[in-house]
């Protein structure tokens, strides 16, 4: 029984695996001010709510060190197991960038998760929608080749609302048409359709440089963009958690 934890800048995903089956999945807000005792209460309540058995192991991927520290302590005190934090060496990947230490743990874990999918060319492009959206190029059997970082769609929407006087916050749902007839539809067109165009354009450029690849989308916005991005071959919102499982099982 593995508890896999993906600590992102905005939200934290937790998955409980029995063998290779994901039997429970939770998402909570990432709060840098929460203490270990608070995370312990949250975890205890989540497990009690679903009547879940305690994990026998825990593995964390994190881009937020203060939360990582408190979450690790909470898991270890509540469940009495070691909570390991993934390092680049744990992934089994050959990280072929200028400074391998700069590669985010979540991106490397995504690469491990992607390698579970069969790719006719042995290459993968992973698109992960979060606070930032990342594009990563991976090559079988274990090569991480680099990528790109763009602003996340919700981050862009929030920034626009904060820095303009008359533009409201909106939910990121696809508009009826590209040509908006009111402010809300115009915003949705620019933010959703514009973002889809960004994704399609980046994937096209990656393929022009590296050749054909299996495109895997993950993160909370992936399902919204699925009908707008024909470049997606796979949408897997649990890719990071599955990558953590593969590392735990020694398949990284």
UniProtKB/Swiss-Prot annotation:
It holds the Pfam family Pan_kinase. InterPro entries: ATPase_NBD (IPR043129), Type_III_PanK (IPR004619). CDD domains: ASKHA_NBD_PanK-III (cd24015). GO terms for biological process: coenzyme A biosynthetic process. Its cofactor is NH4(+); K(+). A monovalent cation. Ammonium or potassium. ATP binds at residues 6-13, 131. Keywords: ATP-binding, Coenzyme A biosynthesis, Cytoplasm, Kinase, Metal-binding, Nucleotide-binding, Potassium, Transferase. Gene3D superfamilies: 3.30.420.40. Belongs to the type III pantothenate kinase family. This is Type III pantothenate kinase. The lineage of its organism: Bacteria, Thermotogati, Deinococcota, Deinococci, Thermales.
